[in-house]
Amino acid sequence: MIESNLLVLTLVIPILTAILLIFIGKRPIIKRYVALVGTLLTLVIALINLKNVLRDGPIKVELGSWKAPYSIVFVVDIFSALLIITSIIITILVILYSYRSIGLDRERHYYYFSIMFMLIGIIGSFTTGDIFNLFVFFEVFLMSSYCLLVIGTTKIQLQETIKYILVNVVSSSFFVMGVAVLYSVVGTLNLAHISERLSQLSVHDSGLVNIVFILFIFVFATKAGVFPMYVWLPGAYYAPPVAIITFFGALLTKVGVYAIARTLSLFFNNTVSFSHYVILFLALLTIIFGCIGAIAYYDTKKIILYNIMIAVGVILVGIAMMNESGMTGAIYYTLHDMLVKASLFLLIGVMYKITKTTDLRHFGGLIKGYPILGWTFFIAALSLAGIPPFSGFYGKFYIVRATFEKGFYLSGIIVLLSSLIVLYSVIRIFLKGFFGEVEGYTLSKKVNVKYLTTIAVASTVITVIFGLSADTLFPIIKDGAETFVDPSQYIHSVLGGK
């Protein structure tokens, strides 16, 4: 009972924090600390939840005094617990970074409120046990993201927000259609119950299941920024301030990735044989087009944004394999990418603060005035590229191993080659931005970026610790992968369990 209450608290605390932020009014200093304390409390509860999951297996809570599959169910397993903890850590870093970067005008209004509600939507998406509430939590974090995109009301923000809203309204409509078709086939919305019902379907209903798969893959691939539904991502994520880009780039696409992994495991593991091939095909195209974008631009933000696409593609290759190696690599690489992308965006934000530009052709020589910033970026770049012993190596190694175990040798080779493109793209930023002639800033008039650099360095240190802790983490992550490869444990914990 206590464990169930703790699971609910990961949603209740951010909700109460958001409500309190409304009543505080236009007092940004107080809002800063309320948002920070609320997020720290949520992190403590999330860590306790992880400890309970490691001890007892997946934990569920049923709301409304009804039993599953008729109740509203929230479930946390190892993967969702790790995603929640990582999301909260990144939220804390973004809040701290915002103190000196986002501006008092934004802070006075609904900035921290929107961050809290986006965190609610993300945590809810990772823990909900039914498909309709997944839609609800998607809408919660999407509406919060709309608010964050327009805060500041610059022309480019408004332009990109309109596109972003349009794309997501269309995908949300398809989501509702998919839920309706699925319910007409199986008569339930509970994820675990849907899995059981789909395994009992006759061949006659397989056509409708194919339609459901197409609808869901369109929706989740759009959220994750998968080719060809990625077109909104570079513009929408480029427009807002760096603190918001960090929040979006590190977290939002991973919600779509998680939804693909969970539904593929529960709904389509055995029912739709071509589903894994479709996801693999889209994943490889996403990697290829992400690589093209990463080397085509001189803008530092766009280079990292296209690296988001590459990472999403690599993760989906592991998910498409749906074996122990593939899912272990996908889980580890997802957590790694969330942390390292946050680090890189925060570092680029510091570089922008100094030079007032993100165009590599217009600045250089930063290492002379800001050596700590430069070498921290170098470490984050190596981690992103997957150079051992940093965290990017281990997840990618398991994903490539999974492709070879399944006989998808070309897929494994594409993943390996993408590492070279990633390394080239980020080392280009390092060499052009930090070496060469001093340009874009005055060496004798250094900009005070100590606070922002400290937050960015802290973020990178967390990434490095994550990589160096691989031996400790992998047994845990392998247990989390088993829930996807063999979802019976998840199903039992929801329908038969605790």
Curated annotation (Swiss-Prot):
CC terms in the record's Gene Ontology section: plasma membrane
Membrane topology according to the record: Multi-pass membrane protein
Function, as annotated: Mnh complex is a Na(+)/H(+) antiporter involved in Na(+) excretion.
Lineage: Bacteria, Bacillati, Bacillota, Bacilli, Bacillales
PANTHER family: NA(+)_H(+) ANTIPORTER SUBUNIT D1 (PTHR42703:SF1), NADH DEHYDROGENASE (PTHR42703)
Segments forming a coiled coil: none
Protein name: Na(+)/H(+) antiporter subunit D1
Cell compartments where the protein resides: Cell membrane
InterPro entries for this protein: CPA3_Na-H_Antiporter_D, NADH_UbQ_OxRdtase, ND/Mrp_TM
A Gene Ontology biological process term: ATP synthesis coupled electron transport
